[in-house]
Curated annotation (Swiss-Prot):
Cellular localisation: Secreted
Signal sequence, renumbered to the chain: 1-22
GO biological process, one term: cell differentiation
Superkingdom field: Eukaryota
InterPro entries noted in UniProt: KRTDAP (IPR028196)
Organism: Mus musculus
Protein's job: May act as a soluble regulator of keratinocyte differentiation. May play an important role in embryonic skin morphogenesis.
Distribution of this protein across tissues and organs: Expression restricted to suprabasal keratinocytes of the epidermis.
Keyword Signal: yes
Coiled coil: none
Main location as per UniProt: secreted
UniProt keyword annotations, A-Z: Differentiation, Secreted, Signal
This protein's encoding gene: Krtdap
One GO term describing the cellular component: extracellular space
Protein name: Keratinocyte differentiation-associated protein
Length: 102
């Protein structure tokens, strides 16, 4: 099932606007003991190598598909199959070997 993108974007922007207006109207109660300096950890954590996998990041930047727009667009199309990708205008000359005459 293909979902048209324009109504989805309009609905999401309406929901975001409603949430922002609701957040602006609310009066949160601020407790000073919740935001004190004593609640924060004293020791610095430093670099956590468990979450910074540099070898994986380097291999991603050195691959042939890095900044390959064909692969990136195909990845987005496969990640979001419910979006009607035929709705968007095609950019001339991107998929053909020779650019189309303008």
């Amino acid at each position: 099932m293909k979902i048209p993108i324009l109504p989805v974007v309009a609905l999401l922007s309406l929901l975001a606007l409603h949430a922002v207006q609701g957040a602006a109207l609310g009066h949160p109660t601020i407790y000073p003991e919740d935001s004190s300096y004593n609640n924060y950890p004293t020791a610095t954590e430093g670099l956590n190598n468990e979450f910074l996998n540099f070898k994986r990041l380097q291999s991603a930047f050195q691959s042939e598909n890095f900044l390959n727009w064909h692969v990136i667009t195909d990845m987005f199309k496969n990640a979001f199959p419910f979006i009607n990708w035929d709705f968007f205008p095609k950019v001339k000359g991107l998929r053909s070997a020779a650019p189309d005459s303008q």
